[in-house]
Amino acid sequence: MKLQNRIELLLMLREYLEENGEEWQMVKHTASIHNGWFTQEFIDLSVKNIIEEFLSQDKLTNWVNHYHLDDAIVPKNVGIVMAGNIPLVGFHDFLCVFISGHMQTIKLSSKDDILLKHLIKKMYSWEVTLQNYISFASILKGCDAYIATGSNNSARYFDYYFSKYPSIIRKNRTSVAILKGNETTDILEKLSDDIHAFFGLGCRNVTKIFVPQGYDFVLLLQSFNRYKYFADHHKYRNNYDYNLSIQIMNNRFYMTNETTLLVESDALFSPISQLNYSFYSEIDGLLSKLKHKKDIQCIAGIDVPFGKAQCPELVDYADGIDTMQFLLTL
């Protein structure tokens, strides 16, 4: 299949998503029932980002031109193990392999095995030969290369099975934010989006903030109030109640707006419903320290503006590993 045909199919997919017809709405509803974390709001947020950042004709064209893609590639079969922490989280890997001209065999997460499968089957209906390029499997074997995303534990498993092949293996990552103390209400509300979107389950969600000594948390806590409706989501509420009880039982100081906990901790990762914080005295030293932390996906307020952590562009490759360059060397 020629590059131009692949681009045209992606633009058809964009149109299908934008139309948001009854069929697609039903699929999204089914996905939200299958996984209680995949609310309609957050499925739509994922789709919006895909439409605007990944399937824009101009952005696709610039991306393709940057790598000088053409039809000369010798197709290899790339196995993709997808995560399932947020809706359509594996779309970018699918897109990279597809636009490169390679074939792919996808192992979907049981948490997110409805949305992407439907979209690819829809693409089959537009171009039947696509079935020769994209397939699904419950077990991956016999592929020429692998891209696998999972927890630190599953990464050891991936290393064992895939290390003898060309591979990208991704582990747990999270994101942090640095505040200077002079942020406006509008900026703090954007940071609140970076924290709360997808219930904080994404690797680009902010789970830890660094604030200057003497920081006043009142405005920050108030900015969280736009997500107070999380208290009505039973899975989130169960996590909040549990984490609150941990703080109380351990007699630890905490702050809360009754939906999100603020806890002083050195840990970068925080459990659902909790945001960790630490104080800093000198920002340059803090930045130098954070740049060497392999667990950090991005730093809101530094790498990306507040409110944009969940809006990665085509070239914002997970873990800083250029997926397209990897594929072009196969």
What is each model feature region?
Residues 77, 127-215, 271, 318-329:
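Conserved NAD(P)+-binding/catalytic subdomain of aldehyde/semialdehyde dehydrogenases
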Residues 90-91, 116, 155-160, 220:
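Short glycine-/acidic-enriched loop or helix-start segments at secondary-structure transitions
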Residues 61, 86, 153-155, 217:
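Glycine-rich nucleotide phosphate-binding loop and flanking beta-alpha elements
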Residues 63-126:
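Conserved small-residue-rich beta-alpha loop and adjacent elements
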Residues 1-79, 275-287, 296-309:
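N-terminal Rossmann-like NAD(P)+-binding subdomain of aldehyde/semialdehyde dehydrogenases
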Residues 66-85, 137-142, 152-154, 260-274:
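Donor nucleotide-activated moiety binding/catalytic core segment of transferases
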